Regions:
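Short metal-binding segments enriched for Cys and/or His
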Residues: 32-64
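Beta-strand/loop-alpha-helix module characteristic of Rossmann-like adenine-cofactor folds
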Residues: 2-3, 9
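Short cysteine-rich clusters marking metal-coordination/redox-active sites
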Residues: 8-11, 26-29
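Short linker/helix segments within small regulatory modules
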Residues: 17-24
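Long, contiguous alpha-helical scaffold regions
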Residues: 61-130
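Cys/His-rich microdomains that often coordinate metals
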Residues: 15-16, 30-33
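Residues immediately within or flanking Cys/His clusters that coordinate Zn2+
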Residues: 5-6, 23
Length: 130
């Protein structure tokens, strides 16, 4: 098992070779890794047509992040496991950000370690914010 791989925020499987924001496409659910959509999981229309939250619902029902990709995704291969902490977004539990109109977020990303945007991990950067 490759513990050094990074998880897809849509399906949770460790398939990415680089930390969040490198636009890798998940071979399991076909989600394109997008830093803005990880930070703002209710926001559609960046690299993916649907929001991360909607993509997670789609994956649960259709096996792919977007309905238009039905038939193009695949199941996890042997050795591809989910991140041990991963779970779908829970609005009652997760303190996720909503983008504000007119705010430039380009300089406010945690560029050194973007894994702090994983809302499901104890290291989530907004874990203590309320």
């Amino acid at each position: 098992m490759d513990y050094w791989k990074y998880p897809c925020p849509c399906c949770g499987y460790r398939v990415f070779r680089q930390q969040p924001g490198n636009h890798e496409k998940c071979p399991i659910c076909l989600w394109e890794d997008d830093l803005a959509q990880l930070r703002f999981p209710h926001m559609p229309g960046s690299s993916n047509r649907v929001s991360l939250e909607q993509a997670q619902h789609n994956y649960a029902f259709f096996g792919t992040a977007e309905r238009r990709n039905i038939g193009g995704a695949r199941g996890p291969l042997e050795g591809e496991a989910r991140d041990e902490f991963w779970r779908p977004i829970d609005p009652s539990r997760d303190n996720v950000e909503e983008p504000q109109h007119g705010v430039n977020y380009a300089d406010s990303y945690p560029l050194a370690d973007t894994t702090v945007l994983y809302y499901w991990r104890p290291t989530y950067w907004r874990r203590l914010a309320s």
